[in-house]
């Protein structure tokens, strides 16, 4: 899979809002995350080739624990077929990577993200109270959140699938991550994220909530998730996060 800029689930404008409106602790967590995001976006080092599986459709997962550091991938804590180690973030990452892989294989006969059998790797407990999750072109990375604004980033299958779907877009469309091209990139990931959640829940489109990030907002935050695809602009309205700014129609965007 080619080198790519990291794709983050929490955009910089939300982090800046927390820096402006949050408590001192919330501001610190958001600023640390924002600084990290800006650093990674400014410098994308080359990466070694990711491992692949030779049998079409065969699922292979590796889950690592970053130990609240920013060293990737971390310590391996679960591999394909290994039982749970009791860490909920590890189990969620393992399960949701698997469900996303199954969705693309069973629905589209797509052999992992790149259609060449890419092994799925995820690292949990990244950074200290890190308020984001991202796909770095080779693997998934999940922060734990701060527990005040965001819960752990493995909690929402649509977020996991959203980020993994950037790997599909990278290998197929090559959409430049800028302005409308970048918006299309994000939109495709939102669609696939919601479809994977529907696949997991065995829902039809009319029964789905079309919320991206269900469960991600911590208790006390006024919102259902990060975005609503059925009612854009209504996902959250909170004193710290502000109001969901997503337009419902193109005329509201231009």
Predicted feature locations:
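Zymogen propeptides/activation segments of proteases
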Residues: 1-158, 167-254
């Amino acid at each position: 899979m080619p080198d790519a800029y990291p794709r983050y689930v929490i955009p910089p404008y939300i982090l800046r809002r927390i820096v402006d409106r949050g408590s001192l602790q919330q501001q610190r967590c958001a600023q640390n995350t924002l600084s990290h995001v800006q650093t990674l976006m400014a410098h994308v080092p080359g990466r070694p080739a990711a491992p692949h599986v030779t049998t079409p459709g065969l699922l292979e997962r590796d889950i690592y624990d970053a130990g609240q550091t920013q060293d990737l991938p971390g310590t391996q804590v679960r591999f394909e077929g290994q039982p749970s180690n009791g860490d909920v973030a590890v189990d969620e990452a393992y399960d949701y990577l698997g469900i996303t892989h199954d969705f693309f294989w069973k629905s589209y006969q797509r052999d992992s993200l790149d259609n060449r059998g890419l092994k799925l790797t995820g690292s949990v407990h990244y950074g200290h109270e890190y308020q984001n999750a991202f796909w770095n072109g080779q693997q998934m990375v999940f922060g734990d959140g701060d527990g005040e604004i965001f819960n752990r980033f493995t909690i929402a299958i649509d977020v996991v699938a959203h980020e993994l779907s950037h790997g599909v877009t990278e290998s197929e469309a090559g959409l430049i991550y800028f302005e409308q091209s970048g918006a299309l990139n994000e939109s495709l990931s939102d669609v696939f994220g919601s479809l994977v959640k529907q696949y997991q829940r065995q829902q039809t489109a009319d029964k789905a909530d079309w919320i991206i990030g269900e469960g991600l907002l911590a208790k006390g935050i006024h919102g259902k998730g990060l975005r609503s695809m059925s009612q854009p602009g209504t996902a959250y309205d909170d004193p710290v996060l502000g109001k969901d700014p997503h337009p419902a129609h193109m005329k509201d965007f231009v």
